[in-house]
């Protein structure tokens, strides 16, 4: 009896997030092990936002001792921790937020681990690097890229926040698009739907049945009338749709005085004309996924995602007759329970048949690849079929490509420099301060008495960076002055914001839900704006 109670308690604790990513998303989160390098203000804020929703386990890698500066900007460290292990202190306090989460720490610098035990990082589902030097992050990124482990770089520098996601390929099954259109198939009706619609006779119904007929049926009925009397094409223009709405409006029952009755289901049908008349077609992004080399040329190493995508493609070419599997859901509407459930079951049963057909194609593909039939679960199959119109594949460039002189994405920088205050300027400044660090062993402005001297040095670093990369862009001196004044500080307000944003992207990667940005995110605390760039 303890188990149901515990599950109930868990559902209560995680109720809001379960509504976002479901039980399967929560399971993925609870089985994940994330490594965070450096228990800085940014690092602990990221972990706070992973521990609270129930990440399975985390490991902090940090060889530093707690300093007064740490206590000043990190709410997870106290004055009594000064001189103690920063990794251990942060881990102990973070674990207090959620007893279900396992916290670990390693009192080593990332540089030491990269030198002596690089395979250490292979045990994690995802690695987060915070406040690392350029040379270290390049080494780490190369290692993880070759091991196919996602890396998220997160940095707070004064009033600037920076994130970079590095992941070779990230398929998203549940992208949860905003304003997704319903999959009603009124323009390409399957036989069972046509038969169900024909079972209604709006002209010979009593008032109660007439006013409780689902709006989908009403639109379908008048669509048939439109085809017979007006045109063999769906109403497309505003004028045609207004004419179609008027056709439906004429079907509202009238009382003995000739006044139209108050039939909310007909008003609902009129309101949903645009939704109902949506053309059933395969989205361009799905066509691109079907034509992707990973879909066309399957191998024994192909992950389940690509095998299922290929199975859906085979379905479209055969049973689907050019259409994706039916989603199997309909929106709530005004109708009596019996009529609504019958209509709902028509769509659900069609979705089940489509899933079974895709499953048959998947089984044949698995057999041809020499893989076990159970290597793809029923849940995976159902999930991908019901989301087949919303699939996404994100591929990020490696960090070495971004930093290479011959592979640097110069066009992306130039195209975003029309505005001299674009967030991309902040990216250029971050590259400049990293160059400053490489040359001087410290960041500009870390000592107050050197701020003025560092302005010229930082400007020189920026100029040389722009010249080396062939960037004929103008960066205002104000930014050079500002970055020197920052002194590489890590204000908690910015760190907290970046911690929330980074945790959100990490959860997207782990659950395979919602679409991650590709590939660089810059936040400006000065203007309270942000932007993403594909660098």
From Swiss-Prot:
Which pathway does it operate in? Protein modification; protein neddylation
Q: Where is this site: Interaction with UBA3?
A: 212
Keywords assigned by UniProt? Ubl conjugation pathway
Name the domain of life.
Eukaryota
Q: Region (Interaction with UBA3): which ranges?
A: 332-345
Q: Which GO terms describe its molecular function?
A: NEDD8 activating enzyme activity
List the residue ranges forming a coiled coil, or say none: none
Q: Name one GO biological process term.
A: protein neddylation
Signal peptide positions are none
Transmembrane ranges?
none
Its biological purpose: Regulatory subunit of the dimeric UBA3-NAE1 E1 enzyme. E1 activates NEDD8 by first adenylating its C-terminal glycine residue with ATP, thereafter linking this residue to the side chain of the catalytic cysteine, yielding a NEDD8-UBA3 thioester and free AMP. E1 finally transfers NEDD8 to the catalytic cysteine of UBE2M. The covalent attachment of NEDD8 to target proteins is known as 'neddylation' and the process is involved in the regulation of cell growth, viability and development.
The record describes its quaternary structure and partners as:
Heterodimer of UBA3 and NAE1. The complex binds NEDD8 and UBE2M.
The similarity annotation says: Belongs to the ubiquitin-activating E1 family. ULA1 subfamily.
Q: What is this protein called?
A: NEDD8-activating enzyme E1 regulatory subunit
